[in-house]
From Swiss-Prot:
EC number: 2.7.7.6
Annotated gene: rpoB
HAMAP family: RNApol_bact_RpoB
Name of the protein this chain belongs to: DNA-directed RNA polymerase subunit beta
Assembly and binders: The RNAP catalytic core consists of 2 alpha, 1 beta, 1 beta' and 1 omega subunit. When a sigma factor is associated with the core the holoenzyme is formed, which can initiate transcription.
Keyword Transcription: yes
Entry GO MF terms: DNA binding; DNA-directed RNA polymerase activity; ribonucleoside binding
């Protein structure tokens, strides 16, 4: 027997074929959401209030300071928030201090700043009763980027861009004449020396002294028309504010506010970190020769002589001195924006090769490591980035790859919320300033100054309508988990589908261990929406990190120390793969090892290896790592497999896969669909609706009983996608449980493991051509035994409003409706729970007042005799739609009188939940986990299905032609291993990239007493004869997908029509008709089917009068009358007339035909028939 037994949770043991030991447990898979939101509550909010505080009025007399904030208790718990359609939120209160400097008076007050949405424990938000997820956004990191470009003559040039978090961009570029230009905030370009002069380096000599002599600078100075600071300032002002009269003072303040005002320009922590890293002097000194002596200014010690080659070892010795004080000098400005001040920079001279002179000296300038808390761009940054640009022109330094994950970062929930909150606060700040100047400073209070509307509005807007705030995909727990770990490059400040090219979408070597190379949607979003890899974490700057095992450089042994590396840190190391063979002491078995260095796979000696992968599955995401034998599948099909698992419908009786990967337990636990214990303890009570756990606490080494935790279970709740969300306990009374153990299974879970489908007996064979083109043949057993039966819950809503003619009423007393239609309604007119409903049945009886009409003399007489007051009401009851039959699961009633919060104008709201049990059906879509999908074409009786020698009929027949061209061989290996596992009565785990080998599969088949090739003789169920060849038969895990035929089947006789063209609407949602398009018309024309064609273009479509009369004729059994003129023709003529054309319609004998509108007689016809020919609003 190969493999070892591993316990997954309390209830499941699997035989694992993994050869690599797990050295690191998987992190909590929804940490990306919860940790980010926690940061926002603890630090993000405080940062925001510090940024905005203090707010001063224009005179400086009044000062408003934000001191502290606190979050109260939410009004309703999570479940109740969903039920009441409200937001799960807590009140945010801020302590504010108002200081009047004239009188010295200080007022403190606590101000309510609105209800702030809270994150649930499972990483979601409840907004207006709907569960939503905030997707993390992948954006370019603020930094300075250098790239190479070729001009139209093929000449090499460079561009540089300084990108802030918010503020003006600064771009450098060269032209064909080797002049360096700068663009400020996408305006017209000016020579870069103009910007330097404006900063305060007025003369040519000052600029040359600052940057060092070189020909590019000389060319730029010659092109520069300005020769002083003032002229340079005016030149820039004219470019930035064309048309305004330029003055030196205005120009100074404009540049000052554009770049050096922290409120207008923000690099954020990450921008400062990246700029300091990029412009650090050590990056450009590596492998260069010094052109000057490096001396320690404090001790006078010579650290390196002129001409020293700075290799890795020499540079490592120099770095501590370079970071302290070596090479620092002060550049003095003589005016300009910086007035007369000192700019601290660091400069070292080196030799570079030159075509003409052999070699020359250039200056390498860094920004002198500007302090981390300077969030705007510093003058030293501008000088150093220009110096780097000149160095690149001389071949020193590196360009950047913008698709590298070192240059792309994540904005998670916390940061997205912070940015939105900042917008609201800045709007509020403006209002506060205005109110300060208007109101009397002696009687004013902080409460009167602050208007919280803009803050509340910006938060509501973000949660309600931002592209990144999405309705949670709750089809099954895996869909839920993946949605929370999704990374989107779209959204505000990101890319758009149309602009994104191939490079951005492509897999990059830096994705390794950070972003899954498999899981991404097919279609226009491919590569723009990704998923976090299973072990990846996000660091404080928003860069993705992946864990590696450290290799001890002294001994060359792999240690148990784990380091999390970002993509650009990893570029400096050689990393071995997780499957490199190790001795017991951690040393490598082989002398030469396959390793990665900067995206290249190379063979290196083992003493050069710095790190080793933690696990083979760190490359892929949670959903992808649920596919066994992933290593045997083509990546395109694996992509479909990963995506289709998310569309699996939760079944009535879920079953965990016989052939799993070991990830089923982890993903089920972290998805949020299971009930997980918060503390260790003992189970005291278990019912279908709740589980009680008594905590066990250790005090002085002794165990004592603590508090009682009560966990509520969800029973048959409707998920966001209309599937059934049901939890079942899997622990018993008296069980001792650990912290974070699964207490109850959620939907699509069995015994604490993800269970999206069922293990069924599959044969790869054809059957009378019914599985042509990936179609699937099913056995009737799967229908009879409810193997693929799923439960679907639909919600219907009806409200009683106040109308101009009086209030609507929910009642059992409905006009023109027989007692039979009311049999299931209670005395209030609402359907009873448990009633069976067919489409068209009344769910909620409701009447709406009609306009009062003038009565005729006869009617008045009758009313006078019988005393009956005319009840002028319309029947507006809620009825079950087509395909909406089922059983009433629950009814919820909300009344304004009972204190329920309802929208304005609504007095009563009734919600009816109808549950459907859907068996598997022809036309449903099914799939395996390897991208092998198909539609059910035929359900055969059990007796017709081919059977095994022992008489067992197979459950499913798949087409063998679906395998070779698709190259997803994993399904065949799964089939054989599944059969062996069924025979042995075990569950197996075959982890991705470290699973069962072919030998393991054949060995397990032999162990189970089967043929080594896994093939069997099959007998035809119809004749009892054996088939000619032996067939691959085994157990495959097949799932039923959310594309069900019941949702797609649709038929219409009459229904709503479009208002303008009077043609039937389209689509099932509108109860529309089938489009008979241009090409279909050609088909009928080709056959000369004139009457059919006339019928389709008139009475079946938009001949308003004709269709009413045709309906009448059919009802009375008379001949169908002659069709009239289609409405769309009348619309066309009206359009032509509106263009000023005189269009008339002539008959064949040149007589003009009058275009009549509907006359009274025709009106009465439609009234008599009482047909609903208008747009039916309830169906829209």
């Amino acid at each position: 027997m190969t493999g070892q037994l591993i316990q997954y949770g309390r209830h499941r043991q699997r035989r694992s074929y993994a050869r690599i030991n797990e050295v690191l447990e998987l992190p909590n898979l929804i940490e990306i959401q919860t940790a980010s939101y926690q940061w926002f509550l603890d630090e993000g909010l405080r940062e925001m209030f510090q940024d905005i505080s203090p707010i001063q009025d224009f005179t400086g007399n009044l000062v408003l300071e934000f001191i502290d904030y606190s979050l109260g208790e939410p009004k309703y718990p999570v479940d109740e928030s969903k039920e009441r359609d409200v937001t799960f939120a807590a009140p945010l209160r801020v302590k504010v201090r108002l200081i009047n400097k004239e009188t010295g008076e200080v007022k403190e007050q606590e101000v309510f700043m609105g209800d702030f949405p809270l994150m649930t424990e499972t990483g979601t938000f409840i907004i207006n009763g709907a569960e939503r997820v905030i997707v993390s956004q992948l954006v370019r990191s603020p930094s300075v980027y250098y790239s190479q470009k070729l001009d139209k003559n093929g000449k090499k040039g460079f561009t540089a861009t300084v990108i802030p978090n918010r503020g003006a961009w600064l771009e450098l570029e060269t032209d064909a004449k080797d002049i360096v230009y700068v663009r400020i905030d996408r305006t017209r370009k000016i020579p870069v020396t103009v910007l330097l002069r404006a900063l305060g380096f007025g003369s040519d000599q000052e600029i040359v002294d600052l940057l060092g002599e070189n020909e590019y600078l000389r060319n730029t100075l010659e092109k520069d028309n300005t020769d002083s600071t003032d002229k340079a300032l005016l030149e820039i002002y004219e470019r930035l504010r064309p048309g305004e009269p330029p003055t030196v003072e205005n120009a100074k303040s404009l540049l000052e506010s554009r770049f050096f005002d922290p409120k207008r320009y923000d690099l954020a922590n990450v921008g400062r970190y990246k700029i300091n890293k990029k412009l650090h002097i050590k990056n450009r000194l590596f492998n260069q020769r010094l052109a000057e002596k490096l001396v320690d200014p404090e001790t006078g010690e010579v650290l390196a002589e002129e001409g020293t080659l700075l290799d890795r070892r020499t540079l490592d010795k120099l770095i501590p001195h370079l970071e302290k004080n070596v090479g620092f000098r002060t550049a003095r400005t003589s005016g300009g924006v910086l007035e007369e001040s000192d700019v601290e920079i660091q400069s070292v001279k080196i030799y570079v090769a030159d075509d003409y002179e052999g070699e020359r000296v250039i200056s390498v300038i860094s920004n002198g490591m500007v302090e981390r808390d300077v969030k705007h761009i510093a003058p030293a940054d501008i000088i150093a980035s220009i110096s780097y640009f000149f160095n690149l022109l001389h071949g020193v330094g590196d360009t950047d790859d913008i698709d590298h994950l070192g240059n792309r970062r994540l904005r998670s929930v916390g940061e997205l919320l912070q940015n939105q909150f900042r917008i609201g606060l800045s709007r509020m700040e403006r209002v506060v300033r205005e109110r300060m100047s208007i109101q009397d400073p002696n009687v004013i209070t902080p409460q009167a100054l602050i208007n919280i509307r803009p803050v509340i509005a910006s938060i509501k807007e973000f949660f309600g309508s931002s592209q990144l705030s999405q309705f949670m995909d709750q089809t099954n727990p895996l869909a839920e988990l993946t949605h929370k770990r999704r990374l989107s490059a779209l959204g505000p400040g990101g890319l758009t589908r149309e602009r994104a090219g191939m490079e951005v979408r492509d897999v990059h070597y830096s994705h390794y261990g950070r972003m899954c190379p498999i899981e991404t949607p097919e279609g226009p979003n491919i590569g723009l929406i990704n998923t976090l890899s299973s072990y990846a974490k996000v660091n404080e700057f928003g860069f993705m990190e992946t864990p590696y095992r450290r290799v001890d450089p002294e001994t060359g042994k792999v240690t148990s120390r784990i380091d999390y590396l970002t993509a650009d840190e990893e570029d400096n190391y050689v990393v071995a793969q997780a499957n490199a063979k190790l001795n017991d002491d951690g040393s490598f078995v082989d002398d030469n090892i396959i390793a990665r260095f900067r995206g290249e796979n190379t063979v290196v000696p083992c003493d050069r290896v710095d790190y080793m992968d933690v696990s083979p599955k760190q490359v892929v995401s949670a959903a992808t790592s649920c596919i066994p034998f992933l290593e045997n599948d083509d990546s395109n099909r694996a992509l479909m497999g990963a995506n289709m698992q998310r569309q699996a419908v939760p079944l009535l009786v879920p079953e965990a896969p016989l052939v799993g990967t070991g990830m089923e337990h982890v993903s089920a636990k972290d998805s949020g669909a299971a009930v997980v214990s918060k503390y260790a303890g003992i189970v005291e009570r278990v019912t279908a609706k709740e589980i009680w756990v008594r905590r066990i606490e250790e005090v002085d080494g002794k165990e004592t009983k603590g508090d009682l935790d009560k966990y509520k279970l969800q029973k048959f709740v409707r998920s966001n996608q209309g599937t059934s969300y049901n939890q079942r306990p899997i622990v018993r009374e008296g069980d001792r449980i650990e912290k974070r153990e699964i207490l109850a299974d959620g939907p699509s879970m069995e015994m604490g493991e993800m269970a999206l489908g069922r293990n069924v007996l599959v044969a790869f064979m054809t059957w009378d051509g019914y599985n042509y083109e990936d179609a699937i043949i099913l056995s009737e057993r799967l229908v009879k035994d409810d193997v693929y039966t799923s439960i679907h819950i639909e919600e219907y809503e009806s409200d009683a409003r106040d109308t101009k003619l009086g209030p609507e009423e929910i009642t059992r007393d409905i006009p023109n409706v027989g007692e039979d239609a009311l049999r299931n309604l209670d005395e209030r007119g609402i359907i009873r729970i448990g009633a069976e409903v067919k489409d068209g049945d009344i769910l909620v009886g409701k009447v709406t007042p009609k306009g009062v009409t003038e009565l005729t003399a006869e009617e008045r007489l009758l009313h006078a005799i019988f005393g009956e007051k005319a009840r002028e009401v319309r029947d507006t009851s809620l009825r079950a739609p087509h395909g909406g039959d089922g059983i009433v699961l629950d009814v919820k009633i909300f009344n304004r009188e009972d204190g329920d919060e309802l929208p304005p104008g609504v007095n009563q709201l009734v919600r009816v939940y109808i549950v459907q049990k859907r068996k598997i059906n022809q036309g449903d879509k099914m799939a395996g986990r390897h991208g092998n999908k198909g539609v059910i074409s035929r359900i055969l009786p059990e007796e017709d299905m081919p059977f095994l020698p022992d008489g067992t009929p197979v459950d499913i027949m798949l087409n063998p032609l679906g395998v070779p061209s698709r190259m997803n061989i994993g399904q065949v290996l799964e089939l054989h291993l599944g059969m062996a596992a069924r025979k042995l009565g075990i569950h197996v785990a075959s982890p991705v990239f470290d699973g069962a080998s072919e030998e393991d599969v054949w060995g397990t088949l032999e162990e189970a007493g089967m043929a080594r090739d896994g093939k069997t003789i099959l007998y035809d169920g119809r004749t009892g004869e054996p088939f000619d060849n032996r067939v691959s038969v085994g157990i495959m895990y097949m799932i039923k997908l959310a594309h069900m035929v019941d949702d797609k089947l649709h038929a219409r006789s009459t229904g709503p029509y479009s208002l303008v063209t009077q043609q039937p609407l389209g689509g099932k949602a509108q109860f529309g008709g089938q489009r008979f398009g241009e090409m279909e018309v050609w088909a009928l024309e080709a056959y000369g089917a004139a009457y059919t064609l006339q019928e389709i273009l008139t009475v079946k479509s938009d001949d308003v009068v004709g269709r009413v009369k045709t309906y009448e004729a059919i009802v009375k059994g008379e001949n169908v009358p002659e069709p009239g003129v289609p409405e769309s023709f009348k619309v066309l003529i009206k359009e032509l007339q509106s263009l000023g054309m005189d269009v008339k319609m002539l008959s064949s004998n040149e007589e003009e035909i009058e275009m009549r509108e509907l006359d009274d007689e025709e009106d009465q016809t439609s009234e008599k028939l009482n047909l609903n020919l208008e747009t039916n609003e309830s169906q829209l």
